[in-house]
């Protein structure tokens, strides 16, 4: 189908604390749009404060799809997101509305836009088997195994990166094919006309200050109490993707007595700034992107003009 005849989908991307949610809510209220969250932290139930999840009032103004869909103990892959997001997009389009995908998890946006390689789902038994081998022989020995079966991935993955190394070995043991071989085939790209926007402050210092201010507000709202409740469950740990989210790890370590309160704040803010830096690095190389300045008047008008 000709792109101009396809239904429109809006991507609203940006670093953390850049004002994406506020602009998305304006879109939902003033135009015929529905919001889909593209955020790997917002998917988790019980992780509200530290993930800057939209408030009850904000959700009443503009409901967000794909938030609170997983327990923090559960995994959620880019492939899971792509399948869920496509289903939500199809539903919104069938209602005669425009989907607005809002967030900062660039890997999810990329998977949705370009498709994914047909990699097998995680297998906990094989993953445990690989971990046991690593405990016995060391990750260097497993990296040697990877070099034999998939030299391209071995060149790309460092021996001190156990998560990616384990995944590459897991893929081979499940499928009998290397990750390099499988990634040469991708699923079909998104069958819609996608109009893409990024929002960020013009000055880096402004973003850094916003991040520090927002973390201070999170602490006043009870972020430490939220992490205390998560720890008290007894089934969560710092190796889970949910607990690796910025802020959560540092609060957890503080509660474990690894460092004092001021150090926790410093580390959490620094980690969030690093996340924002990575997000901006992705966006600077993103093709066909329309840039908006955080807090600028007329962003909504500019966005809608570009979407015509």
Curated annotation (Swiss-Prot):
Keywords: ATP-binding, Magnesium, Nucleotide-binding, Transferase, tRNA processing. It catalyses: adenosine(37) in tRNA + dimethylallyl diphosphate = N(6)-dimethylallyladenosine(37) in tRNA + diphosphate. ATP binds at residues 14-21. PANTHER family: TRNA DIMETHYLALLYLTRANSFERASE (PTHR11088:SF60). Belongs to the IPP transferase family. Monomer. This is tRNA dimethylallyltransferase. It comes from Shewanella baltica (strain OS223).
């Amino acid at each position: 189908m000709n792109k101009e005849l396809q239904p429109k989908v809006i991507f609203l991307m940006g670093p953390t604390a850049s004002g994406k949610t506020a602009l998305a809510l304006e879109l939902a209220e003033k135009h015929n749009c529905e919001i889909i969250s593209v955020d790997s932290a917002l998917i988790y139930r019980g992780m509200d404060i530290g993930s800057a999840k939209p408030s009850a009032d904000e959700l009443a103004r503009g409901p967000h799809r794909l938030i609170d869909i997983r327990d923090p103990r559960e995994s959620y892959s880019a492939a899971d997101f792509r399948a869920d997001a496509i289903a939500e997009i199809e539903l919104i389009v069938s209602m005669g509305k425009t989907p607005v995908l809002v967030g900062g998890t660039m890997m999810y946006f990329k998977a949705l836009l370009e498709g994914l390689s047909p990699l097998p789902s995680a297998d906990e038994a094989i993953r445990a088997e690989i971990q046991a081998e690593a405990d016995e022989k060391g990750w260097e020995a497993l990296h040697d195994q990877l070099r034999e079966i998939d030299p391209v991935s071995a060149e790309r993955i460092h021996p001190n990166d156990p998560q990616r190394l384990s995944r590459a070995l897991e893929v081979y043991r499940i499928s009998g094919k290397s990750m390099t071989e499988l990634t040469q085939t991708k699923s079909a790209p998104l069958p819609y006309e996608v109009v893409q926007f990024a929002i960020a402050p013009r000055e880096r210092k402004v973003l850094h200050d916003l991040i520090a201010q927002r973390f201070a507000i999170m602490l006043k709202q009870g972020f430490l109490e939220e992490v205390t409740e998560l720890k008290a469950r007894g089934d969560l740990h710092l190796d889970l993707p949910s607990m690796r989210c910025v802020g959560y790890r540092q609060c957890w370590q503080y509660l474990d007595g690894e460092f004092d309160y001021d150090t926790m704040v410093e580390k959490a803010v620094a980690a969030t700034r690093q996340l924002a830096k990575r997000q901006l690095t992705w966006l600077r190389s993103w093709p066909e992107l329309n840039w908006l300045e955080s807090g600028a008047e007329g962003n909504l008008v500019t966005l809608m003009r570009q979407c015509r």
